[in-house]
């Protein structure tokens, strides 16, 4: 219990993604002193468009100094997998000033769900830089003027000279991304994409498979992960760039 404690725990969960979670679960969290808020609550999905505007971010920030992000949600299936295989995912730990970017993303989301604007410097403590790697936190949303993530991917693909490797659970690229990948492959860049042989949603997986022939004709190499469900979203390029994405190569994630 956090009652009477100086520690503050905030949980922002997606309301649609947690439809099957009983209300008692959140009541117990709040009773223990945890602030839990659902993102864009949907009670009657047939009568609202909010069901399409979901929050797919997985962010943990601890004391403003350490953060975790990646593909992992919090559920038993992420540990136990399926009867037909493991759940393969990637999550990363971040230390240093890049944590500020994830803290900003979380607090912005918190304002949406709680209407509390949090700007205290205690959430952005001064800290030294770690190592010499450059890191940028890029966020995107459906109402922004620019599709920052898609534009960043386009720049990364067009800038690659030797290789560009992708892991993604769902391969539903926008037309610009698809064209960029094929163009790079035709120009001699080693383009490799790994997707799961079997996915958690059949319809989405069939849609992903529909792109493969066209891409392979352009020279893109396709690999199927066979040990279970691949949920990891990774990009590695030219020994100079790596990303751990929440973006799933899906037009809905622009």
Identify the residue ranges that each predicted region occupies:
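A short, well-structured juxtamembrane/interface segment
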Residues: 148-152
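Signature of lipid phosphatidyltransferase scaffolds
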Residues: 52-137, 141, 241-249
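Conserved small/polar residues in nucleotide/adenosyl-binding loops
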Residues: 2-9, 247-254
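Structural alpha-helical scaffold elements that stabilize or flank donor/cofactor-binding regions
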Residues: 156-157
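Short, glycine/acidic-enriched loop or turn micro-motifs at the edges of active sites
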Residues: 17, 74, 253
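PLD/PLD-like phosphodiesterase catalytic module centered on the HKD motif
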Residues: 10, 16-61, 160-165, 170-249
């Amino acid at each position: 219990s956090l009652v009477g404690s100086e520690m503050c725990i905030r949980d922002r969960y997606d309301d649609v993604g947690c439809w099957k979670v009983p209300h008692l679960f959140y009541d117990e969290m709040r009773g223990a002193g945890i602030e839990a808020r659902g993102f864009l609550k949907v009670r009657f999905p047939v009568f609202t468009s909010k069901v399409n505007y979901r929050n797919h971010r997985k962010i943990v920030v601890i004391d403003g100094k350490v953060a975790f992000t990646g593909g992992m949600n919090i559920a038993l299936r992420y540990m136990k997998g399926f009867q037909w295989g493991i759940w393969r995912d990637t999550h990363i730990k971040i230390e240093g000033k890049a944590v500020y970017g994830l803290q900003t993303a979380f607090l912005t989301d918190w304002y949406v769900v709680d209407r509390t604007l949090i700007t205290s410097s205690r959430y952005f403590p001064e800290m030294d830089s770690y190592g010499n790697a450059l890191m940028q936190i890029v966020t995107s949303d459906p109402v922004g003027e620019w599709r920052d993530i898609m534009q960043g991917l386009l720049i990364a693909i067009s800038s690659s000279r030797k290789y560009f490797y992708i892991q993604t659970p769902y391969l539903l690229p926008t037309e610009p991304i698809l064209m960029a990948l094929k163009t790079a492959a035709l120009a001699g860049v080693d383009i490799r994409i790994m997707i799961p042989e079997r996915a958690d949603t059949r319809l989405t997986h069939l849609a992903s498979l529909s792109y493969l022939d066209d891409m392979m004709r352009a020279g893109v190499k396709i690999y199927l992960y066979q040990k279970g469900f691949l949920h990891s979203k990774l990009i590695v390029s030219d020994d100079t760039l790596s990303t751990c994405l929440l973006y799933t190569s899906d037009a809905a994630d622009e």
